[in-house]
Amino acid sequence: HGTNTPFAQWIDQTTKTVELGTTVKANGGVYGDIVAGLKLLVQDGKKLNGFAFDRVVEPTFLSAVDNNGRPLFVETPLEDTASVVTPGRLIGRSAYIGDGLTTAVVPGTPNTGGIVGYGGDWSQAVWGTVGGISYDVSTQATVTINGALTSLWENNLVAIRAEAEFGLLINDVASFVEYTDHTAS
């Protein structure tokens, strides 16, 4: 969300916001909210080629249908195993549901925060790692396991510490819309 970043722009700087649950069912409900985000981008000459949402909206998407009764989020599993990220489609575009995208709701008049996802032109975002992944292996350290100090050597254990530094650069924050749910807890 732009905290502790060396970059001048981050995704939360977008001025385009749509609150999920504000479009009445007769006008499309959550489907209408998703399309409202598309409209904000198109009116600004931007495109929408994908979505990223937090798992807190999964029940909302799975229970939402358009005016013809078709499901809003169509899951497109790529394999038979459970994935960390759930791939799917929203209004004909790639969508991913995962963990770690939400921000807390800040009570007030009106409430703020409550970001649950983003839609936009993901070619305007790049990510990478600095220096790859570094790791250390130890059989002699003492670590805390379930609140107790445990000797790796005495218990025939191995500890592996892996570290990586990742970065996300947003080229054009106007190419994104954030979706919020100010009622989320």
Question: Language-model features: where?
Answer:
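Short helix/loop capping segments that flank catalytic or ligand/cofactor-binding pockets
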Residues: 60-63, 126-127, 169-171
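C-terminal hydrophobic structural anchor segments
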Residues: 96-148
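Active-site lining segments that contact anionic ligands and/or coordinate catalytic metals
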Residues: 48, 92, 110-113, 122, ...
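A structural signal for short secondary-structure junctions
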Residues: 43-45, 108-110, 126, 151-155, ...
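C-terminal structural cap/anchor segments
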Residues: 53-118
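Active-site proximal loops enriched in glycine and acidic residues that flank catalytic Cys/His/Asp
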Residues: 15, 52-57, 61, 76, ...
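Alpha-helical scaffold segments that mediate packing/assembly in large oligomeric complexes
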Residues: 1-43, 67-68, 83-85, 90-91, ...
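Protruding loop/beta-arch "assembly-hinge" segments enriched in small, turn-prone residues
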Residues: 150-185
